[in-house]
Each structure stands twice: as C-alpha cells, then as structure tokens.
Amino acid sequence: MIDDTLLESEERMTQSVEYAREDLTTIRTGRANPSMFNGVQAEYYGVMTPITQMATISVPEPRMLLIKPYEPSIMNAIENAIRNSDLGVNPTNDGQVLRVTVPQLTEERRKEMVRLAKSKGEDARIAIRNIRRKGMDELKRIQKDGEAGEDEVQAAEKELDKTTHEYVSQVDKLIEAKEKELMEV
C-alpha cells in the first residue's frame, strides 16, 4: 500500500513537470520556434486540425519560420489561422510557402513573459505540493487503518518529502532556463 501511494504520487508529479514543460514552450521568446504553433488549428476538410499536422515547419534563420503545407490548397487556411491566433505574427504567402518573421520582443514584453513563466511555474509547484498533501493524507489513512506501522509511514513520508523537493527543483530549473532564454537579446 505504501509503495503504491509513493509510486502514484511520483507518477503524478512527473506528469505535472511534463505539463509545465509543455506549457512553457507556448511562451514566445522572440526566437523562431516551430512549437509556437502547437496550439494553432486550421480547418482541413471540415475538421479543425493542428497546423503542425498539415505542414512542415522549419527554421532557416533565428527569427524566421518557413511553413510548407503538404497540400497547396490549404495555404490560405493555415495563413488565416496564424493571423487569427494570439501569437502576434503575420505570415507572408509567396504561393509555395508561408514565411513568418518573429518580431523582436520589447523589454517590457520580455518582463511580461517572464512574469507569465513564473506564474506557470508557481502553478506547477502548487500542483506538486497538492499531490504531496494527498499522498501524506493517504499515508496517514494507511497508518490509522493499521495497514502499516508508524516507522514505515514516517519513512514513507520522508521519501515523499524528498521526491516533492526533487520535482519542485525540476520546475525551478525549467523556469530559470525559460527566464534566461526570454531575457537574452
């Protein structure tokens, strides 16, 4: 029972860190990055489809993306989806590919993005701590029900605290790296 509780808590903490990592990739850094289009969808045969599944996206220059649709007929749909997204970029259509120039971020916008990254990091930390709290409650229940002794439960609580600290530290490193990336000019 104790091992199951620890394992389940660790799996959920891993999921929280992965979610935070993916969430942070959506924050624009002023550099061209194909993952900035992960949330953008365009209509494709009547179905909303991520543009990452409709085209190849490459980075020929640090601040430019090339989007080459698999079918030329969907060029306008992709172009409109990018224009209507909240990414703040404007694609140029040359008939074969879409060119997207990523504008340089202003200092104020960079600081705003850092605040957003820190906020997302704090959300991940809170999620990890909530997982810890649920794990601790479960360990106390196990002890109360007589399924494990006090020493075993205390050892498991220490292990859960150690695991929590490791995962919070991973989130801190992600935020630190994102902040460094954002503040680079």
From Swiss-Prot:
Q: Which GO terms describe its cellular component?
A: cytoplasm
| Pfam families named in the record | RRF (PF01765)
Q: Mainly resides where?
A: cytoplasm
A GO molecular function assigned to this protein is:
ribosomal large subunit binding
Task: Tell me the domain of life.
Answer: Bacteria
Which SUPFAM superfamilies does the entry link to?
A: Ribosome recycling factor, RRF
Q: Which UniProt keywords apply?
A: Cytoplasm, Protein biosynthesis
GO BP: translational termination
Q: What is this protein for, i.e. what is its function?
A: Responsible for the release of ribosomes from messenger RNA at the termination of protein biosynthesis. May increase the efficiency of translation by recycling ribosomes from one round of translation to another.
UniProt lists the family membership as follows:
Belongs to the RRF family.
Report which gene this protein is encoded by: frr
Q: Where found in the cell? A: Cytoplasm
Species whose genome carries this gene: Corynebacterium kroppenstedtii (strain DSM 44385 / JCM 11950 / CIP 105744 / CCUG 35717)
Name of the featured protein? Ribosome-recycling factor
Q: Which NCBIfam families match?
A: frr
